[in-house]
Amino acid sequence: MKRNPEFLLRDVAGTLVVVPVGSAVREFSGMMMLNATGAYLWELLENEQTIESLTAALVERYEIGAEEAQADVSAFLEKLKPTGAVIL
């Protein structure tokens, strides 16, 4: 999976948000706020990733357990999937 190029990460008054651009605006006209972990995952999704590779990246960066990292990745992806921001 990877991020949809028609969604961009922006800093709006100190808050990180993912916003649709181009034709994606017709499908999703809102924005999604991300914390630092979500922004890190978003950056990783510039390239093709798997749940396992994203989980491993969180374990390494934040020194957390694999179960916690996988739960964070799953929650992040469940938030993004309905918007079309992630291409599976």
PLM regions and their residue ranges:
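Acidic, low-complexity/disordered tracts enriched in E/D and polar residues
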Residues: M1-A39, E43-E46
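Long, charge-rich, low-complexity alpha-helical segments
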Residues: G30-L88
